[in-house]
């Protein structure tokens, strides 16, 4: 369940046990549909795209509309937020009203998402693994002409066309039969009376509807807490790192358009020169198998280190 408290505005807090279950590969997917007024969307079929989040709608036509992200008290961005493993999140707190976001100034104009990650517990040790597997397929395709149907139609309409002697369904050639989705997370935590430690490793794989399109995200997280001087001093240290490797299609929309409009008499193999034949009679249409071969690899790595010291002077008074 999500809890709400009303002061001068509204605060929605979604705990770990209330987040979406199943094949969830990002914090945005875990949050989707859990808080009223928060809109989460993602481009379908593209595994490399990151979900967008709108907490207070579109507040700017020229500036950014992403909410301010705060992870364990440290300012972050949507890239780092989407890199977090869902299993490493303890809770998400969403601040929507201007009265609640005013403390963050203009940075909180589009709303604020406060992320609290999982930590080790005093006097408690555990080892856990969580994994999900899923598949995705193209639900429905256009019914394309075969090569013989294409020839007959072109002749009956008196159209000029190139006959390359093949019979290719280019949609079938560029699409995967089955795309895999995987999410793996393993964590270890240990605690004594005065200290705690938690370490985790995560891996996410998302394969798209198109061949040669996928995203792999590797994460590592380490958090430690130490109490000193009869617990009057609390020291916290956290390290989070991620690396995202993406194979991005050069132009997904052009590829689908070309696959549906390309001359099916063209073969699905290269010519003697090792090149893909192009239909010179086609307008704004390219051989989709040639487009599929264009490499567009993207790698993004980030590291976040944060620390905190809390002094408990007397009961109820901390600095």
Segment roles from a protein language model:
Residues 305-311:
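Alpha-helical support elements that line or immediately flank enzyme active sites
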Residues 51, 67-68, 261-265, 313:
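Proline-rich low-complexity regions
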Residues 1-222, 227-240, 304:
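Short, small/polar-rich motifs associated with maturation and membrane association
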Residues 87, 265-268, 289:
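Generic low-complexity segments that are intrinsically disordered, proline-rich and/or Lys/Arg-biased
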Residues 142-144, 171-177, 250, 281-299:
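Extracellular/periplasm-exposed beta-strand and loop segments of Gram-negative cell-envelope proteins
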Residues 142, 147-156, 241-280:
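A surface-exposed, glycine/aromatic-enriched loop/edge motif typical of exported proteins
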């Amino acid at each position: 369940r999500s809890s709400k408290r009303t002061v001068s505005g509204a605060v929605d807090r979604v705990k770990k046990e209330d987040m979406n279950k199943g094949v969830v590969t990002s914090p945005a997917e875990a949050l989707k549909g859990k808080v009223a007024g928060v809109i989460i969307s993602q481009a379908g079929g593209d595994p490399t795209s990151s979900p967008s989040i709108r907490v207070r709608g579109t507040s700017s036509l020229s500036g950014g509309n992403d909410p301010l992200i705060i992870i364990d008290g440290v300012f972050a961005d949507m890239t780092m937020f989407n890199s977090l493993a869902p299993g490493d999140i303890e809770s998400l707190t969403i601040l929507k009203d201007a009265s609640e976001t005013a403390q963050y100034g203009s940075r909180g104009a589009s709303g604020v998402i406060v992320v609290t990650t999982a930590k080790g517990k005093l006097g408690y040790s555990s080892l856990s693994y969580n994994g999900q597997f899923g598949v995705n397929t193209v639900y429905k395709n256009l019914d394309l002409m075969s090569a013989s149907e294409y020839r007959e139609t072109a002749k009956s309409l008196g159209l000029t066309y190139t006959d390359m002697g093949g019979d290719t369904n280019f949609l079938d050639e560029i699409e995967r039969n089955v795309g895999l989705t995987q999410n793996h997370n393993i964590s270890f935590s240990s605690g004594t009376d005065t200290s705690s430690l938690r370490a985790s490793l995560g891996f996410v794989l998302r394969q798209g509807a198109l061949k040669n399109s996928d995203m792999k995200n590797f994460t590592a997280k380490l958090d430690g807490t130490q109490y000193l001087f009869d617990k009057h001093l609390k020291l916290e240290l956290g390290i989070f790192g991620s690396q995202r490797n993406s194979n991005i299609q050069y132009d997904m929309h052009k590829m689908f358009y070309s696959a549906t409009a390309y001359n099916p008499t063209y073969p699905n193999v290269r010519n003697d020169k090792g090149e893909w034949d192009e239909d010179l009679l086609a307008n704004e249409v390219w051989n989709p198998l040639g487009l599929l071969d264009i490499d567009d690899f993207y790698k993004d790595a980030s590291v976040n280190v944060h620390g905190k010291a809390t002094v408990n002077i007397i009961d109820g008074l901390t600095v």
